[in-house]
Swiss-Prot record:
Transmembrane segments: none annotated. This is Small ribosomal subunit protein uS2c. GO terms for molecular function: structural constituent of ribosome. It comes from the Eukaryota. CDD domains: RPS2. Belongs to the universal ribosomal protein uS2 family. Gene3D superfamilies: Glucose-6-phosphate isomerase like protein, domain 1 (3.40.50.10490), Helix hairpin bin (1.10.287.610). Keywords: Chloroplast, Plastid, Ribonucleoprotein, Ribosomal protein. Coiled coil: none annotated. GO terms for cellular component: chloroplast; mitochondrial small ribosomal subunit. It is found in: Plastid, Chloroplast. The keyword Plastid applies. GO terms for biological process: translation.
Length: 236
């Protein structure tokens, strides 16, 4: 895997608050190598380590995107949801930003059935068939469609399991992470000072609570994916 320059700037990360961790009482001792200091009761992440692992993650997604691989971005907490959707849409990735439904990947056949139902209902709505049904039936199907749009809208074009999963918050998305580990799907994970750095394939130590921090990390990864996709288009 070729190393590239991704313009990862320590000052920019500081401005985004990437270095702010959790309170010292909430830390995971396994994060010790990634912590540079304690300040006013909170741990401070070593941004040099952040830059190193973010750069490795960018190299990985660039390489994967240049070979036509598919990505899934997962981040369901309120602070991350909008940034996840915007990043995924920009890079033409799949995403889950409302709730990870248990078994979404490990029980893919069930997810696939739901997606087929979702696509059928969308087609019926677009063609006006729903409005020609009795009111009660139409209302029930519209509620189903709304529910499916909320939870599966970001993966509506998925036709199989993703090649790489990017996870915004390890603790919040622990079920998704465990499913990826079970299936052997490579993962890139933002990890705060209360997380386990050994679970994901690439763990990026960073503030997973601040919107600016989440957005900065996602923007770097998305840029690398887009660059990789451009390379794939030029050299299919």
């Amino acid at each position: 895997m070729t190393r590239r320059y991704w313009n990862i700037n320590l000052e920019e990360m500081m401005e985004a608050g990437v270095h702010f961790g959790h309170g010292t009482r909430k830390w995971n001792p396994r994060m010790a190598p990634y912590i540079s200091a304690k300040r006013k009761g909170i741990h401070i992440t070593n941004l040099t380590r952040t830059a190193r692992f973010l750069s490795e993650a960018c190299d990985l997604v660039f390489d994967a995107a240049s070979r036509g691989k598919q990505f899934l971005i997962v981040g369901t907490k309120n602070k991350a949801a909008d940034s996840v959707a915007r990043a995924a849409i920009k890079a033409r990735c799949h995403y889950v930003n409302k709730k990870w439904l248990g078994g979404m990947s490990t029980n893919w056949s069930t997810t696939e059935t739901r997606l087929h139902k979702f696509r059928d209902l969308r087609t019926e709505q677009k063609t006006g068939r729903l409005n020609r049904l009795p009111k009660r039936d139409a209302a029930m199907l519209k509620r189903q469609l709304s529910h499916l749009q909320t939870y599966l809208g970001g993966i509506k074009y998925m036709t199989g399991l993703p090649d790489i999963v990017i996870i915004v918050d390890q603790q919040e998305e622990y079920t998704a992470l465990r499913e990826c580990i079970t299936l052997g799907i490579p993962t890139i994970c933002l990890i705060d000072t209360n997380c386990d750095p050994d679970l994901a394939d690439i763990s990026i130590p960073a503030n997973d609570d601040a919107i600016a921090s989440i957005r900065l990390i996602l923007n770097k990864l998305v840029f690398a994916i887009c660059e990789g996709r451009s390379s794939y288009i030029r050299n299919p």
